[in-house]
Structure formats: structure tokens, C-alpha cells
A protein has these predicted regions:
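Bacterial N-terminal signal peptides
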Residues: 1-8
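N-terminal, motif-rich segments that launch catalysis or mediate targeting to/interaction with membranes
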Residues: 8-130, 141-145
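Functional cores that coordinate and move charged inorganic groups
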Residues: 132-135
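Active-site microenvironments of hydrolase-like enzyme catalytic domains
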Residues: 138
Length: 145
């Protein structure tokens, strides 16, 4: 019974990520939709790639959440927005222990921007699908407390 429940929970998580990435395409400006809409199936299927890596790659887990309550109270003015500054203030081990999703989103966005500059379309698609996953994770209340 526990295995069945586990499978249902995992499947719902995968399904939610796929729906979010799929629907996100329709909120894009027309100039971006021209590229993304023909590739909507790729973005949908690969929305779950980060979760597939989560228990295989040690560094992956902390990219999916952040224990915000560890950093004071809203609006978290003392929390550094820059990764290097955050590492100086809290140490990398502590940051990884409590999750790095906002900083990882920034890193992924920089990689995606670089892929656009290089016109590396396969990389653009992969990074877009994964960035959608991390942004969605950042908005899950249980991933942010």
C-alpha cells in the first residue's frame, strides 16, 4: 500500500511539472512562442528531468527547495540575492543543506541566456524545460519552508 501511495505522489509531482511547463508556453510573447510552441512536447516531457536526477546526483537535491524560515522573516532583506555573497555569509555547505533554488534559478537563467546568444537550440530547449521545473519548485509551499 505504501508503494502505491509513493507512486501516486511521484506521478502527481511529475504530472504537475509537465502541466506547468506546457501551460507556460501559452503565456509567452508571440516572438518567443514561435520557437517554443512547436517544441511544446519536448518542454512537457523534459519538465521532470531534474526530479529524475534528484536521487542519483548528490548536488541535485538542494536545487529544488529552500528553507526560507532559516533566513529570518519576510521580506528576507538580509538574505543575499547573489550566490557568492550568500556563500560568504552562510557558507556553501549550510546553503546546500537548506536549499539553493533561488540561486540555482539565477544560474540556470544565465546558462539559458548564453545558449540563446550561441543559438544552441537543443541546449535552449533542455535548459528551458529544466528552468521551468525549478521555478515551479520555488512556488511549492513545502519547498519553501
Amino acid at each position: 500500500m505504501m508503494l502505491l501511495l509513493y507512486q501516486q505522489v511521484c506521478c502527481w509531482g511529475f504530472y504537475a511539472h509537465q502541466v506547468i511547463n506546457h501551460q507556460a508556453v501559452f503565456s509567452l510573447p508571440p516572438s518567443m512562442m514561435a520557437f517554443y510552441k512547436p517544441n511544446i512536447d519536448f518542454l512537457t516531457v523534459h519538465a521532470v528531468d531534474p526530479d529524475k536526477r534528484r536521487y542519483i546526483v548528490d548536488a541535485e537535491g538542494p536545487r529544488h527547495f529552500m528553507d526560507l524560515n532559516r533566513y529570518g522573516s519576510y521580506p528576507f532583506d538580509a538574505l543575499p540575492r547573489n550566490w557568492d555573497t550568500a556563500v560568504e555569509k552562510y557558507g556553501e555547505d549550510s546553503l546546500r543543506k537548506h536549499g539553493i533554488v533561488p540561486w540555482w534559478i539565477h544560474i540556470m537563467l544565465a546558462r539559458l541566456t548564453n545558449a540563446f546568444r550561441q543559438k544552441d537550440y537543443p541546449r535552449i530547449l533542455r535548459l528551458s524545460a529544466e528552468l521551468g521545473h525549478y521555478i515551479a519548485d520555488a512556488h511549492v509551499p513545502l519547498h519553501a519552508n
